[in-house]
Amino acid sequence: MPWLQVRLAISPEQAETYEDALLEVGAVSVTFMDAEDQPIFEPDLNTTPLWSHTHLLALFEADADPEQVFAHLRLLTGAELPEHQAEVIEDQDWERSWMDNFQPMRFGRRLWIVPSWHEAPEKDAVNLLLDPGLAFGTGTHPTTALCLEWLDGQQLDGTQVLDFGCGSGILAIAALLLGAREAVGTDIDVQAIEASRDNAQRNGVADEKLALYLPEHMPAMQADVLVANILAGPLVSLAPQLSGLVRPGGLLALSGILAEQGEEVAAAYAADFDLDPIVVRDGWVRISGRRR
């Protein structure tokens, strides 16, 4: 069925006011979207971050009158509206559309990420079947791709791999399929832990091969290989902790880092690692090295 979509161009300071007002006048959903394709944001603690220029999208039943919606918003907020528009959009099978656009992808020489509803293009390759669920990591983002290609290029046979910030579990599971003896995944999000567990089962990974923990429950360890695809801020602040999680002679790969943040992150690890040249792709970087 069709819907009336209302779009408002707002600042972060206006977000809560207009979200509440839209719900008050009958919106069935309200969504925040980046208005300027800003690649990333890193919030301060105890804040609810938004992009500096944000679009607020609200859906109403198709018979809602947009002019009445706008009039009520003016009354509720006591102010003139920011830039705004309304249009009728047709309903779609969004899940099917997304599934159609998520195709098998190759990383490095051996590794393929294959959506669980697709046939593997190369039966004899290392095929990781993925159902990303809430899209914690599918391989489509440059940072995930950089980490997957790095894993494909390593000799992982018999190693223990730590995936710090595991999300969908894609990196930990890839490491196991590429020969790692065991993997450990940790994430602050319980849903990420569940997504990782589901994807491991889908790929026939035995429970004893992949241990998943919230950070506060993770045991003391030193891994042969650590991969962390998170954000530059945490990578810098956690550098002593992450460095300590890699055994001497072990390997490290970091991403989730914008190109302009690369030198700062590399500097945080330079004292403990012999670092490789930074690899850049589409404005994102990968930092890797070997523990001294």
Curated annotation (Swiss-Prot):
S-adenosyl-L-methionine binds at residues 144, 165, 187, 229. It catalyses: L-lysyl-[protein] + 3 S-adenosyl-L-methionine = N(6),N(6),N(6)-trimethyl-L-lysyl-[protein] + 3 S-adenosyl-L-homocysteine + 3 H(+). Keywords: Cytoplasm, Methyltransferase, S-adenosyl-L-methionine, Transferase. GO terms for molecular function: protein-lysine N-methyltransferase activity. GO terms for cellular component: cytosol. It holds the Pfam family PrmA. Its EC number is 2.1.1.-. It is an enzyme of class 2 (transferase). It comes from the Bacteria. Disulfide bonds: none annotated. GO terms for biological process: methylation. It is found in: Cytoplasm. The keyword Cell membrane does not apply. PANTHER family: ELECTRON TRANSFER FLAVOPROTEIN BETA SUBUNIT LYSINE METHYLTRANSFERASE. Methylates ribosomal protein L11. HAMAP family: Methyltr_PrmA (MF_00735). Belongs to the methyltransferase superfamily. PrmA family. This is Ribosomal protein L11 methyltransferase.
